């Protein structure tokens, strides 16, 4: 088992993981072309050659990034996969000199255990006007905004 930066051949497996969550309305759907375009922002968690988890770090501004598209295969949940993936994003964000990382989530307890705190979505104008306006739930988003200061 290992966490690593995603590569082009991983895109279809990442897409399949994300589709599972999108079909349950737990995250926005991401197209395969979008994943290819942003493959450098993804990490994967691999077990015996199979991708069982993924996450993406989206940079929004000079001091702000988002942990997004966090997905773990059902059989791998509650084993630290998600935590390790988010930790990889936080380490990359620190290395890039970012000061704050946020997430929009339905799993606030998970992020709270990692040191994230609750914030208002209004603190994230770049996200709101770029991604959120495309969401079918906008403006009545039911995800919880959380952030961590690095």
Positions of the model-derived regions?
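Conserved N-terminal entry element of GNAT/NAT acetyltransferase domains
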Residues: 1-9, 144, 148-150
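A short, internal acetyl-CoA/4′-phosphopantetheine-binding micro-motif in the GNAT/acyltransferase core
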Residues: 70-77, 106-107
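Conserved GNAT acetyl-CoA-binding A-motif
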Residues: 93-106
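C-terminal "cap" of GNAT-fold acetyltransferases
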Residues: 124-150
